[in-house]
Regions:
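Extended, charge-rich alpha-helical interface modules
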Residues: 1-121
Length: 121
């Protein structure tokens, strides 16, 4: 099996690992779990130093995003595109801003040569 090495920022690496951890908390199916564990393990192997000590912060944010998006999906399936659905959308928006801020903080802390940028008009 071919593996591509792609440069990413340290914040992006931690974010990706944390998303895989959240998937493992919520996923079922042996094959899916095996695939997610494999990807997570490959990424964790690439982590050096003490960067993994920041992983829980990303897991906390991404778990909240997962939970809010699940609530949105449930409401959409039920045809309930109401004020609560809009509130959930705003919550995802704010959580993603928090996630970006955490990635930027980690990138600055470890002097990552790759920096994620956002631009809104």
């Amino acid at each position: 099996m071919k593996i591509y090495n792609v440069p990413v920022s340290i914040g992006e690496l931690l974010d990706k690992i944390s998303i895989l951890e959240v998937k493992l908390m919520n996923m079922y199916g042996d094959e899916k779990i095996k695939n997610v564990e494999n990807e997570r393990n490959l990424l964790v192997e690439r982590c050096d130093g003490n960067i993994l000590e920041h992983l829980q912060e990303f897991i906390t944010i991404n778990k909240k995003i997962w939970d809010v998006l699940q609530q949105q999906r449930d409401k959409e399936r039920a045809g309930e595109l109401d004020d609560e659905f809009v509130s959930l959308s705003l919550e995802v928006y704010h959580l993603n801003d928090k996630r970006f801020a955490k990635k930027s903080q980690i990138n600055d802390m470890y002097d990552s040569c790759i920096k994620e940028e956002k631009h809104y008009n």
